[in-house]
């Protein structure tokens, strides 16, 4: 018996390996793998079902069909192990070897491997420097190629058609050699001397001027170097020997009725063998050339189909007209080996069932049906039954369990105790989609789920199903309990807020409990303690909502954990006093002494977690839930039709709107307004009518008038059920109530345009047929959108996970001083995100000082928690430089200090945390909530955009940011710079609002003036763009010739005449080269200079400019010299929602991006060409001027002679991330992407921490382009990982050599995933063929650094609990082999394990 065990053990040991290398297999290597040549296309004998000899399933080559039994039956049983039968030639061994042993086919003629031929760029083509078309013509026998030119005028690699070849033969005889087919290509490849080629090309590179040629040579050089360094030989891209897959991996299964189900590969192999055998025979017979050629071509095609069916020509189809699945199809795509079998596997010890509510469970429990538990824990039960002596053998135990003897249930109870199970609901969008619970046995067949974890699972009880998994080993149970238990996952990893907040019924119950009612029964009573309140409530003396006075006891916990009690009397209600009973000690009573809506409850739980920690919060959350359910039941809140009160004013409001619409209609018919204006106005009228109706309705619903104790009328918040549900945040919203009791309002057509006749009815009144029909559009669109959205969002998540999967925290501090400067986010007049929310949980990068002093408030490397943020707010700090993963210096990972707080745990992140995957999940999970559509800005919205003044919302002082300005004759400031901003600062120096002010805005207030809320501080004309004079003087026209460069126009109404500059296209030839301008001269007739510069005050006028001054007129500073009419900006569709997020992460270029200045300098315009303007920037330091052609229709923001800074906007438009990175640097591009992504999510009310987006951006920025190679081995223009360049540069600097210079590159997430160092990870993501081809040619080796690679090879991942295992392995690898581990006998191991299990199961 012992021998048997020993024998079984030794087969499963795999050798340790550091990485996986992929390369090309030489013919000799293929032969060395093989156990014999497959010569016949036969598979198995259909009568005996025995494999045919030398066929595709031959037992002699691949091994026996039955365990330890040769084919003819001469040798059976274990004792003949390893004998080779002399009759049938089969080795007696396990049948498992049929999964491992390969065969081979010797090809009669070499065949090109289709991956290296057709996978773009064609590797064979690059190697030979020939085009793919030419090579294909050679391979498929359409033309000859010269192999040895000899002494002739032909060139090596030259193509010859059949005729040319015959001519050449006549001319030169056998001086030269030309061939066709794969043999020819093979000889060409064999003749390449890699070393010589590399030397020649490296010498040639510096002298090449043409960009395309340099690119081509660099590509070829890279390929040849890859071959040279990896030891691959180019001729191995042509196959001489074809390996045959082991037969059990391409099985043939007999079905009943004498038919067979077979893997497609068998068909493909059969074709290859048939053609190969036929070709051999033809060659032996010395058949005519044309027949042999045809057969060779067919062989090439059948091998192509076997390797990658459908890559060339039409795919070979089987009997049922579908393409056969080739070897390449086996590994790629969702059903391929990578994604189906290696990255996701099915597991045993799992069950699934429908879920129902378990309102009586505790947070760490779930209800598990008895039947399910019995099945899942069977092995444990057998073991326990045997151990207790209730069953003698496993078989007996099995019988007992099948009969469900009473003892079995006792044993099951025992087994289940403290044994967590994992519950999972598909789709698992983030890590909270699998959590561990302790099972509680229940009758019935449905799993019971705790209501508070529904939010994390996104589960509801309308038929959702969930799966149960049992962690078997001790380690797995330990991990499930300590990391995955629902009680340990209270905070969301996406934003650090509680994810187990009550919703729906619970919220309604708590809200109802905490409301107050005027003149309730028992109002005005005073109680000595909360217990007394409860007594009064239970006996019916005081009702739940009565306003009373109560003396309460509060506990405060100091920093050192010391508790102090204090008593005070508070004005409160009976309900709130009852709520305070479940409030944990240490929280202030004020937290429940208010109307408890959903937001308040969430804040309450958050406060509880931060102040009292995990355990108290869990208990408190459960208590809140029980209380909420109880009082929601007591309240009797329900939805009745009478609760939907329709306001009386509705009908008059609708009538008024109809009258207004009629008026507009009349104006339109008499031609006063255009069709477009009429449409927009009608929509505006109805939109505002709808607003008024819904306001009237909400006012009506939300208050009621009651008689108070003094007999007077008083209004209070209403107890209307529907209003309470909406107000508490339990269910429904004002918009939904509006449709029930107000009016449904305007509807959209399927194309997104708004129908101008609104639905004036509501659901209580009911809709007529037309109204109902209009409504169906929206409902259908919603359903279609949802389906699309789910797929798109899932794909985005997959790309994000793939790009970030290998990012892990690997050290505590990288020591960098870099970071991002955080300020509060302000848009227009609102603080969208205060500073505290942006820096909470981050680490300070540079000391923060007390304002105006040199004293340090928060030293560098402080982790900013809630207390620190309060301090920053106290001292009104409004910018902090914090560490960020984008600027982290760690190679192949990030450090804990740059990441900051682990949001799901609330402390500094641990080493080994897989932050990349968490970030991807946090961004991808809310993806399904984002909208899919692009917004058409039409009707009401488009006119709002043309504001003509800036009105402030808060009092404060005015501050200008990068604004140049002049003072006009009225003493007001006029802005004469482009990207100026005006901000309002409060008395503490905090910024409250910020507005962009364009060129030509007139400021009503000077800088540092104080303003009151509601004041207008700036005015401008939104429809024209002025040119403002910066000096006072008299006007001189330059190149202004009537009829040539300008025309005079007189306004009919006012009689004023103005000069209009003509567009270049409209001018006669004489005016084409002229450049009309206005020059300002002083009283002495000399040119005036722009103040502070040597530039003459000369303003060039673009086409269509309107000049209202005459020649020689006097002008003051700040006056408008000319106006350029702005055509109302085209209403651009705003891409919103999911597509916008995807565009940002894919770093796609917008259609018409903003044009940014490439250098700092002075603007001038050069010679114009057809349709384009030439913009010239002359650098201030006198460098070479930079020119750029810009289409004429782009609205430029700059004038001649103006100074611009590098990266400033020259022409408006959406900014391209690549430009921002190039011109403004890495921090600006990070800021831009973070803000843009956050805008989309914020619109949907989804909170995601900036950190997660930064993690993805770090991965998008991980490549760089080498600009100067220095003394490194990189090539200029090569794309390399930044970490690798940094490491190489450190070594070079240490040796005193020249380091390489590089520029960071921004890659979209798909590009970045495919460009990762690990080819296994890239291949399992997308474009498997291309990735593997590239890796094989380069002989790449995968160091298995990331998570995916390790999952695929079946190891622990280098993150989380597997992190320690990997660190110790890496250290062991560096320190050399470890000493032998002392062996341990089976009995000892069993004893140790029993002790361990005993420990775990003991009540202590």
Curated annotation (Swiss-Prot):
Pfam families: RNA_pol_Rpb1_1, RNA_pol_Rpb1_2, RNA_pol_Rpb1_3, RNA_pol_Rpb1_4, RNA_pol_Rpb1_5. Binds 1 Mg(2+) ion per subunit. Binds 2 Zn(2+) ions per subunit. InterPro entries: DNA-dir_RpoC_beta_prime, DNA-dir_RpoC_beta_prime_bact, RNA_pol_asu, RNA_pol_N, RNA_pol_Rpb1_1, RNA_pol_Rpb1_3, RNA_pol_Rpb1_3_sf, RNA_pol_Rpb1_4. Transmembrane segments: none annotated. Its cofactor is Mg(2+); Zn(2+). Zn(2+) 2 binds at residues 814, 888, 895, 898. This is DNA-directed RNA polymerase subunit beta'.
